[in-house]
Regions:
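Active-site environment of divalent metal-dependent phosphoester hydrolases
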Residues: 4-14, 34-36, 121
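Extended substrate/RNA-proximal surfaces in nucleic-acid metabolism proteins
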Residues: 19-121
Length: 121
């Protein structure tokens, strides 16, 4: 079993799911949210589709800060053949405009499970 959780995005999950299926590995679809307080929260869903729908809803709460590729690298969206199909221009590691409690509530409302990340910080 693996879980792949990109920051504030689920767009690479279809490619990860295809790779996991080829290798007979169970995928737990997820994302890592950065809350308004800059706390990190993992969220897991039963299906890739549910996680992607949640990711689309969360995207509206991400600051429109552009990614600095020289500093953060290219934010690629890949397909199942490991080919780039898109580049995310918005900085994905930025904080959402939602506080921790609101993120947790939205995850639960969407049928997901939330787990605080990096709790030693």
């Amino acid at each position: 079993m693996i879980a792949v959780c990109d920051h504030n995005s689920a767009r690479n999950l279809p490619a990860v799911k295809a790779a996991a299926d080829r290798m007979n590995v169970l995928l737990l679809p997820g994302m890592e949210l950065t809350t308004r307080e800059e706390a990190h929260m993992l969220c897991y869903f039963r299906t890739v589709q549910a996680c992607m729908a949640f990711g689309e809803a969360i995207y509206a709460h991400l600051a429109p800060t552009p990614n600095n590729e020289r500093f953060f690298g290219r934010q690629q969206v890949m397909n199942e053949r490991d080919e780039e199909i898109d580049v995310e221009e918005r900085l994905l590691i930025g904080a959402l405009d939602l506080p921790f409690e609101a993120c947790a509530a939205r995850i639960r409302e969407a049928g997901g499970l939330c787990v605080p990340a990096h709790i030693n910080r």
